[in-house]
Amino acid sequence: MAGGVGARVVVGRHIYGNLYGCDPQILRDESALITIIKEATKIANAMLLSVGSYRFGPNGGLTVFAIVAESHISIHTWPEYGFATVDVYTCGDHTDPKAAFDYIVSKLKPQKVEAFFGDRSMYKE
Amino acid sequence: MAGGVGARVVVGRHIYGNLYGCDPQILRDESALITIIKEATKIANAMLLSVGSYRFGPNGGLTVFAIVAESHISIHTWPEYGFATVDVYTCGDHTDPKAAFDYIVSKLKPQKVEAFFGDRSMYKE
C-alpha cells in the first residue's frame, strides 16, 4: 500500500473496483445488499454510523451506502448490465478495507473485476 | 479522461483528492460544508437524493455526504491537520464531476491538492 514519502499523519486507504458479469438478482436485491454492506463494515473493522439505500432508474439499479466513523463504503449497481461498482475507503491502521472489498466482491459474484487502490493518507511534509 | 477500450455502456467518472493546508474553520463548519456539497451537486449537474453529515472524534472532524442519482459526493475533514479528502463520482455524459470537484476545492482553500481520476465506466467487451 505505497504512496508518498515520510510519516503518515492520517492513514487512509481506498480500494475501489468495477465489477462485470455480476449476478443480476443480487444487484437488484436491496435487503441483500444492505446485509452485505453491514457485514463488510464489520470485516473492515470499521464503526457503522449510518446505512442508506436508493433505487434509481427503471431497471432496478441501486445505491447502497454506509457511513463509517473511518470514512465510507458504497455499492452502485446496474442489474440490466450485470455491472456494479464498489468503494471501500477507511482510515486508520486498525481497519482492513481490502478484506471488506474482497468480501463484497465474493457476494456479487462477478466474472471480471477491475480493482484499484487510492492512497488517501496525509503525509508529514 | 482515458481508460479501457471500445464503447462505453455506462459512463462513470470519479475525481478524488487529498487536500493539504485547508482553512480549519471551514473544515469544522458543518452547515458550510452542507451548503458547499449541495452547490457542488448543482455544478456537477447531478440530481440530489440525500445529504448526510457526521461529526467524529474530539477535534471536530466531519463527514459530509451527498447521494445523487448519478452516484455520490463526499467530503471528509481533519481540522486539526488542515486536511480533507474529497470524492466526486458521477455517472452519465450530462454530468461534470471535475467542475464540482474544483468548486469544492476552491471553497476549502487548500495550499496543496493531490488530485486523481478513477474511470468507473463499463466498457463493451
Swiss-Prot record, chains A, B:
SUPFAM superfamilies: S-adenosylmethionine decarboxylase. The active site is at S71, H76, C91. Binds 1 pyruvoyl group covalently per subunit. GO terms for biological process: spermidine biosynthetic process. It catalyses: S-adenosyl-L-methionine + H(+) = S-adenosyl 3-(methylsulfanyl)propylamine + CO2. Is synthesized initially as an inactive proenzyme. Formation of the active enzyme involves a self-maturation process in which the active site pyruvoyl group is generated from an internal serine residue via an autocatalytic post-translational modification. Two non-identical subunits are generated from the proenzyme in this reaction, and the pyruvate is formed at the N-terminus of the alpha chain, which is derived from the carboxyl end of the proenzyme. One of its GO terms (molecular function) is adenosylmethionine decarboxylase activity. Transmembrane segments: none annotated. One of its GO terms (cellular component) is cytosol. The record marks E70, S71 as: Cleavage (non-hydrolytic). Its EC number is 4.1.1.50. Its cofactor is pyruvate. Pfam families: AdoMet_dc. Belongs to the prokaryotic AdoMetDC family. Type 1 subfamily. Heterotetramer of two alpha and two beta chains arranged as a dimer of alpha/beta heterodimers. NCBIfam families: SAM_DCase_Bsu (TIGR03330). This is S-adenosylmethionine decarboxylase proenzyme. It comes from Pyrobaculum islandicum (strain DSM 4184 / JCM 9189 / GEO3). The lineage of its organism: Archaea, Thermoproteota, Thermoprotei, Thermoproteales, Thermoproteaceae.
